[in-house]
C-alpha cells in the first residue's frame, strides 16, 4: 500500500520537475533570435508557396521525368503547407501576434488542408494535447478503424485521406454557428477550386477528370507516412484512465515517442511531428526549429531524472504494428496505472 500523503508528495515532485524543465527550456528560448523562434519555419512555408508555380508548370511538360517532378513538387508542398503549416498555426507557433495567428490558422487549416479550424483546435490542441493517451479523450482513437484488416489499413486506407478530410470537416460544421460554417465552406471551396482551376488553366489538363485525378495523386503523395506517424508515436505506448491520469511530465514522457531524423518528413511534417514529438508535447507552442533546438535539453533532463524518453525507428514501428495490429488497432488497449504518480 502507498503511505498516507504519498500521492500529494509525488504530485508536488512532478510539478517541481516540470517547473525545472520549463525553466531550462525558457532559458534557451530567451537566448534565441526571432529567426530561430519563427523565421526558419516561416521561410520553409514561404519556399513551399513559391515552389507551387514551377510545380504547376512542370505538369505541362510531355517529358515523363519533368511531369513526375511536378507531381513531387506539388505533393511535397501540399504536405508542407497542410501538415507543417496547419500544425504550427493551430498551436500559435508561427507568430506571437494573436491576430496574425488567427489568419494563418484559417489559411493553412481551411484553405490548404480543407478542414475546420475550430475542430482542429478542439480535437488536437484541447483534447489530444490536454489528455495525451487518456482513453476516450486524447488517445488517438480517431485513427483506429477496427473494420479494416492490417494490410488494407496500412497500405490502402491512407489513399482516402484527401477525400475523407473535407467530408469530415463538413460533418463537423453541424456543431458550429452558421456564420462560422459558411466561412469554413467558403475557404475550403476556395482551396479546392484554386488547385483544380490551376491544373486546367496553367498545367493544361484537358478534362475535369484528369485534373481531379492529379489532385488526388498530389494530395496522397505522403499520405502513408502521415497516417503511420500519427499512430506510431502514441498507440502501443501506456494508456491512462481519465480518473487516474498521471501528472503532465509523466504523461508526456510515457505516452509520446520520437522517430529519428527523416529529411523529407522533417521538411514536410516538421520536427515537432517526427524527431521532436516528446518536446512538442511538453512545449506545444514552440516552433519546429525551436523543438529541435531544445531537444538536447529535454533529452538530457529526462535521462538525468530517470524518466522515460521513448525513441524508435520508422521501420521498427511499422513492423511492430503489422505484427501486433489486432492488439494495437482493434482491441481496447489496457490501462496503465502508475501508483503514486496520479
From Swiss-Prot:
* TM region positions: 39-59, 63-83, 151-171, 185-205
Q: Name one Pfam family in it.
A: FA_desaturase
Q: Where is this motif: Histidine box-3?
A: 277-281
What is its pathway?
Answer: Lipid metabolism; fatty acid metabolism
PANTHER family (UniProt xref): FATTY ACID DESATURASE 2 (PTHR19353), FATTY ACID DESATURASE 6 (PTHR19353:SF13)
Query: Where mainly found?
Result: membrane
What are the record's GO terms for cellular component?
Answer: membrane
Which GO molecular-function terms appear in the entry?
Answer: oxidoreductase activity, acting on paired donors, with oxidation of a pair of donors resulting in the reduction of molecular oxygen to two molecules of water
**The protein, known as:** Fatty acid desaturase 6
Write the gene name.
Answer: FADS6
Give the record's GO biological process terms: fatty acid biosynthetic process; lipid metabolic process
> Where is it localised?
Membrane
Signal peptide location in the record? none
Reported EC number(s) for this entry are: 1.14.19.-
Where would I look for the motif Histidine box-1 in this sequence? 87-91
InterPro entries, per the entry: FA_desaturase_dom (IPR005804), Fatty_acid_desaturase (IPR012171)
Keywords assigned by UniProt, alphabetized: Fatty acid biosynthesis, Fatty acid metabolism, Lipid biosynthesis, Lipid metabolism, Membrane, Oxidoreductase, Transmembrane, Transmembrane helix
Q: Where is this motif: Histidine box-2?
A: 124-128
Which top-level group of life is the source organism from? Eukaryota
| Bilayer topology | Multi-pass membrane protein
Query: Hey, which family's this protein in?
Result: Belongs to the fatty acid desaturase type 1 family.
Amino acid at each position: 500500500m502507498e503511505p498516507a500523503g504519498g500521492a500529494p508528495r509525488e504530485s508536488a515532485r512532478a510539478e517541481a520537475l516540470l517547473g525545472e524543465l520549463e525553466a531550462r527550456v525558457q532559458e534557451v528560448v530567451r537566448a534565441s533570435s526571432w529567426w530561430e523562434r519563427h523565421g526558419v519555419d516561416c521561410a520553409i512555408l514561404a519556399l513551399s508557396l513559391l515552389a507551387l508555380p514551377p510545380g504547376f508548370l512542370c505538369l505541362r511538360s510531355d517529358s515523363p521525368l519533368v511531369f513526375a517532378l511536378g507531381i513531387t513538387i506539388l505533393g511535397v508542398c501540399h504536405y508542407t503547407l497542410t501538415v507543417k503549416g496547419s500544425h504550427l498555426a493551430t498551436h500559435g507557433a508561427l507568430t506571437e501576434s494573436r491576430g496574425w495567428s488567427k489568419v494563418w490558422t484559417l489559411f493553412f487549416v481551411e484553405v490548404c488542408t480543407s478542414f475546420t479550424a475550430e475542430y482542429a483546435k478542439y480535437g488536437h490542441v484541447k483534447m489530444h494535447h490536454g489528455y495525451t493517451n487518456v482513453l476516450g479523450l486524447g488517445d488517438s482513437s480517431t485513427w483506429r478503424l477496427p473494420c479494416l484488416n492490417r494490410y488494407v489499413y496500412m497500405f490502402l486506407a491512407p489513399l482516402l485521406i484527401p477525400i475523407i478530410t473535407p467530408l469530415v470537416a463538413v460533418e463537423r460544421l453541424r456543431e458550429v454557428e452558421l456564420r462560422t460554417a459558411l466561412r469554413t465552406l467558403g475557404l475550403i471551396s476556395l482551396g479546392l477550386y484554386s488547385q483544380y482551376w490551376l491544373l486546367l488553366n496553367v498545367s493544361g489538363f484537358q478534362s475535369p477528370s484528369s485534373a481531379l485525378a492529379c489532385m488526388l495523386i498530389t494530395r496522397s503523395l505522403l499520405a502513408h507516412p502521415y497516417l503511420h506517424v500519427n499512430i506510431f508515436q502514441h498507440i502501443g505506448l501506456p494508456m491512462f484512465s481519465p480518473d487516474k491520469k498521471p501528472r503532465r511530465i509523466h504523461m508526456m514522457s510515457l505516452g509520446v515517442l520520437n522517430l529519428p531524423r527523416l529529411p523529407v518528413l522533417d521538411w514536410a511534417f516538421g520536427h515537432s511531428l517526427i524527431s521532436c514529438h516528446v518536446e512538442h508535447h511538453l512545449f506545444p507552442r514552440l516552433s519546429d526549429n525551436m523543438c529541435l533546438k531544445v531537444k538536447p535539453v529535454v533529452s538530457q533532463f529526462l535521462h538525468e531524472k530517470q524518466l522515460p524518453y521513448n525513441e524508435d525507428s520508422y521501420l521498427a514501428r511499422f513492423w511492430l504494428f503489422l505484427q501486433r495490429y489486432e492488439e494495437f488497432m482493434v482491441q481496447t488497449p489496457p490501462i496503465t496505472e502508475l501508483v503514486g504518480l496520479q
